Amino acid sequence: EIAQCLVGSEMCIRDRDNTDWSKYNGFVKVYNQSVDIASLYLVSDMLITDYSSVMFDYSLLDRPMYFYCYDLQKYKNVLRGFYFDFENSAPGPVSVTTLSLVDDIINERHKDFAEKYGEFKRCYNPWDDGLSSSKVIDVLFSHNGGSEGV
């Protein structure tokens, strides 16, 4: 269902379970755990994830995020739970079925989460202003910082 929704696209999957993806050859590129996930962020247009912490890093890119949480209630109530109100704070649509996930992607429902996305970034990445390198250079070469501050 997801493959049909993304016709003409290419999916990059970082597989933990050694799933057989061969029937999707040419459409799905599979990467094992040795591949740095950050390199996949850079070539992606959107993220489909579950409760993974990748949402925090990926939010820095200002790209759409969709959450496929087929086991949401079990995860929340039986397995691990959350450190924050995931359902109300997620920076994108939360789907519990593949049908609703596909519908969310087709209808670009991530656009309905612009405000929540901004709140999420302000909460979890408050220092990100795109000027980190400049700030480091300023500290390294400032008269007050000098080499003794490094």
Q: Whereabouts are the PLM-identified features?
A:
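Catalytic binding pocket for nucleotide-activated donors in carbohydrate/polymer assembly enzymes
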Residues: 19-26, 53-124
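Short, contiguous acidic/charged loop-to-helix segments that flank catalytic cores in large enzymes
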Residues: 30-38, 89-92, 125-127
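C-terminal alpha-helical cap of glycosyltransferases
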Residues: 129-150
